[in-house]
A protein has these predicted regions:
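C-terminal accessory extensions/subdomains outside the catalytic/core fold
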Residues: 718-741
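Short, solvent-exposed positions on alpha-helices
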Residues: 627, 678-682
Length: 741
């Protein structure tokens, strides 16, 4: 099979991985008719862990598929369909390691404390798997995310529920006013290709190299910033008191998954401040059992189980005393007593803030009811945009999905741009002093005063991605005849340099008749919301973090979920990366499958990505059959939405597997109805007839398995045979698809 007719479909984690077992056989059968090979690559958390230890695993070793796809992404042949994957926190990583060890893989434990070189090596390998380790490797291009018309029209006809807003809502965002990254940012543009060094000159005269060498290119922007531990602690102490005084829930919204170095540290400091009385009282024993603040209070509950019962009870009683004295915390699961401060990866800002805004600005309390909430987002860089949304909702009420406009996004993300590429240049500082960034000649580029415990970070943004981003923004503005707003803050050093580049590169394009503006994020948000409420569309052109935040915020308001977005990454070397929506991997869906054999994951994102992938392949390699498949898949998706065949949430109704059957039925019918390719018409006419005649039988077979627990042999690494059996319970459907192949 020639390389050009190949689509790579990624195996990932949790709900999308389970859905793949049902959908992929259908996709393989349909695409084979156009001489397209669909191959899989495993970039799941379990797969990435196993690929990190080939020496230890011997014959059980597996290839490093992520590295392979990273190499592929910089070639013109790349055509990758990327499903959501876990961005692992430390507790998730440890759970996955434990599961794999139980399955017979000779993996080393995750070393929590590091003393030997071997432990350092093991820890470094595992840490590479943590956080958002996948997307930066594959995203060798910028981001084009938008709601397809069929999806937008469906949302207007079938609006999701939006909570009403009260004008006197006490919900608000709390952010630092000094001592944060925003207030300390410095930026420089690199004149010629070089390498820079990051070193800490401590007050005691010692120098510690934090990072020996970071290669930089001509025209690249590098920036540094510091978040003060002292300022963070005094800020959170004041906000805890204020939440108590106002009688609102206290919640914390970070991104400990992607920002895997900085945000767990911030989370840990908030845990330390909130529980300080109990933690101080039991400091010695908590240190002995290895409690790590950065892993959340859930880590404490897990570790005290090893203590004698009376000691355990005493610590638990003192924690309960903290809850009695402190403001109520927002809950992740009020039935199970899991708070916002239990696990750093449970509340992720880009998903949690839209959910709060959609729920009238409220979050769940211990009583299982919704309450007004103080949302703590410590750093000012992006916190203020959410406050602007809250103020808009307070003044104008909830958004109306039946009338609101759309906010597509063009996002700068190629080459690990901005904060999302900063992890290997982020450090918790060990001693008071000055962190200096110097070039290869020892010339000082930037310096930051620091104190022990502070978080220092350096970000990089290369010039070619900025040029490509500006071009993509102009192209989308023209193609959709929509205003495009660059969200850039002139008060941020980094953004100031980006503004100069944007203004220069816009001159390289014909912008006549286009409405392209540069606005500070809060102003851009107000402008966009005003247009949105009038039913008007506005393209947001943003950096990497706002790309992430806004492509959750607006789709959740417009469509009820970000998983229904068309998410295309036109790779800079000519290939295509097609992301299935902009959401996560839905662990609660897996829980429901295991308990009730019912998977409510909606594969609409996969359908949209596959259609875009087929179109790209058809255009790039002049494959007319691929174009017919793409066009008919779009038609089938429209019919799928119109006929309301998306998964429901409750047993006894259609779930993910049933939705795949209906997609196959409608796709086959669309292929049978088209006249562009008579061979495809004949081939799929028979399948369409078989599926239509057996609809009742297939639906009955799919639904018959629901309502009882199912064993798939693992969570992070489910057994392929058991999972396939669970996800393909209709023999009639399986036989029809097998016949097509």
């Amino acid at each position: 099979m020639p390389t050009r007719s190949k689509i790579i479909y990624t195996f990932t984690d949790e709900a999308p991985a389970l859905a793949t077992y049902s959908l992929l056989p259908i996709v393989e059968a349909f695409t084979a008719s156009a001489d397209i090979a669909v191959e899989t690559r495993d970039i799941s958390l379990a797969g990435r862990i196993l690929a990190s230890f080939p020496e230890q695993l011997g014959t059980k070793a597996i290839p490093d598929h992520l590295a392979e796809l990273g190499d592929l992404a910089v070639t013109p042949e790349a055509n990758i369909i990327k499903l959501p994957n876990i961005s692992a926190s430390t507790p998730q990583l440890q759970a996955a390691i434990k599961e794999l060890q139980a399955q017979g893989y000779a993996l080393p434990d995750y070393p929590e404390t590091v003393t030997t070189d071997a432990e350092k090596e093991t820890r470094a390998r595992y840490d590479k798997v943590k956080g958002s380790a996948v997307n930066p490797v594959l995203r060798e291009g910028n981001s084009d995310r938008r709601a397809p018309l069929s999806v937008k029209n469906y949302a207007r006809k079938h609006p999701h529920k939006m909570g009403a807003w009260a004008a006197d809502s006490k919900s608000h965002i709390a952010h630092m006013n000094n001592g944060d990254f925003y207030g300390s940012e410095k930026a420089v543009q690199i004149e010629a290709a070089d390498a820079v060094k990051i070193a800490l000159a401590a007050k005691d005269g010692t120098t510690t190299v934090l990072k020996e060498k970071t290669n930089v290119q001509a025209g690249e922007i590098i920036d540094t910033a510091v978040l003060s531990k002292k300022a963070l602690r005094s800020f959170i102490a004041a906000e805890i008191e204020d939440a108590k005084k106002q009688g609102v829930l206290l919640s914390v919204h970070l991104k400990a998954t992607m920002m895997k170095v900085s945000d767990p540290i911030m989370f840990g400091q908030i845990v330390a401040e909130f529980y300080k009385d109990a933690l101080a009282k039991h400091a010695t024993v908590l240190e002995q059992i290895g409690f790590n603040l950065n892993n959340g209070i859930g880590d404490l509950y897990a570790r005290i189980k090893a203590l004698p019962a009376d000691q355990q009870a005493q610590i638990e009683a003192d924690i309960q005393a903290v809850y009695a004295a402190r403001p109520a915390l927002a809950m992740v699961n009020s039935d199970k007593g899991i708070t916002n401060l239990h696990v750093p990866s449970d509340v992720i800002v880009d998903a949690s803030m839209p959910a709060m805004i959609r729920d009238s600005g409220k979050m769940w309390g211990t009583d299982g009811q919704l309450h007004d909430t103080k949302a703590v987002i410590p750093d000012r860089c992006y916190a203020t945009i959410y406050q602007a949304v809250i103020e808009d909702c307070r003044a104008n009420g909830a958004f109306d999905p039946t009338t609101m406009g759309s906010v597509p996004n063009v996002g700068l993300m190629a080459k690990k741009a901005e904060e999302y590429g900063s992890h290997d240049k982020t450090f918790q500082i060990k001693a008071d002093g000055v962190v200096r960034v110097t070039d290869s000649q020892g010339n000082l580029l930037m310096e930051q005063n620091v104190e022990a415990g502070d978080i220092f970070r350096m970000c990089q943004t290369k010039d070619a991605p900025i040029q490509d981003w500006v071009k993509l923004a102009v192209n989308r503005a023209r193609a959709s005849n929509t205003p495009a707003i660059f969200w850039l803050d002139p008060k941020r050093a980094h953004d100031g340099v980006v503004v100069e580049k944007v203004q220069a590169y816009l001159k390289d394009h014909n912008t006549e008749g286009l409405d392209i503006r540069i606005m500070a994020p809060v102003d851009a948000m107000k402008f966009t919301l005003e247009r949105t409420r009038k039913g008007l569309d506005t393209i947001s052109v943003t950096g990497n973090v706002l790309r992430d935040y806004l492509t959750d915020l607006f789709p959740i308001m417009e469509l009820g979920t970000s998983a229904k977005m068309l998410s295309i990454v036109p790779l800079m070397n000519g290939g295509g990366l097609f992301e299935t929506g902009a959401g996560g991997s839905a662990p609660k869906h897996v829980q429901q499958l295991l308990e009730e054999n019912f998977l409510r994951w909606d594969s609409l994102g996969e359908f949209l990505a596959l259609a875009a992938s087929l179109e790209h392949l058809g255009v790039t390699y002049n494959n007319p059959k691929a174009l017919v498949l793409s066009k008919t898949l779009d038609q089938a998706t429209g019919q799928f939405l119109d006929n309301n065949k998306s998964p429901s949430r409750k047993v006894g109704n259609i779930d993910n597997r049933g939705s795949h059957f209906y997609l196959a039925l409608y796709w086959a019918q669309a292929l049978a109805a088209q006249a562009e390719d008579t061979a495809l018409q004949a081939q799929f006419g028979e399948l369409a007839k078989t599926l239509a005649e057996n609809e009742a039988t297939i639906v009955a077979e799919l639904n018959a398995v629901q309502g009882k627990p199912v064993d798939i042999g693992g969570y992070y690494a489910p057994n392929p045979e058991l999972t396939s059996k669970a996800m393909r319970p209709s023999n009639t459907l399986n036989a029809a698809i097998a016949k097509l192949k």
